[in-house]
Amino acid sequence: MVAMSAKHVTLIVLIALLSPFVPINTKLILEKYVALFNPSREEVRQFFCTTWQKHTDGSLLTPLEMLASQWMELHPEFQAILSDPSGALEQEFTPEKGITNPFLHLSMHLSISEQISIDQPPGIRQIANTLSKKLDSEHEAQHQIMECLGQVLWQAQRDASALDANTYLESLRKLL
């Protein structure tokens, strides 16, 4: 069994809470956990920066850090930010600046990876695998999935409604 710090477990919990497809009863349990160990924006950013530092140093990584570092490796445009923890903690990433928020982007990669690994919503794993083969790139497939997830999240927020798994899956199927 791999030992994980409270911060790593909390990040996993936050990813699960962000996922619209984790069952409600599980989310209620997770929300109680988050109420006790709710990491700040700085702690989440620190997780990614520390993981990147450990990765570049060749240090031993936890399974979550290994997954995160694989996505970081595929995003050289984020690596300078990840290599500067103090700058990363202070920087604001707003649409007006035209800069992608690397921490949101990487968190979405982790969330989508989790959705695929547990096949939630049911069918996403097959869609992701088919799309990866079609595009000959798991990374590009995740970026297209990310666009669909972002759209469904935006619609739910705009309408003050729950996320619609069917709409999400329907938009993913259109990618095929």
Walk through the language-model features, giving the residues of each.
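Short alpha-helical scaffolding segments that buttress acidic/His motifs in well-ordered protein cores
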Residues: 48, 68-72, 111-112, 128, ...
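Methionine residue identity
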Residues: 1-4
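Short hydrophobic alpha-helical segments enriched in small aliphatic residues
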Residues: 6-9
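Core of compact, soluble alpha-helical bundle domains
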Residues: 35-100
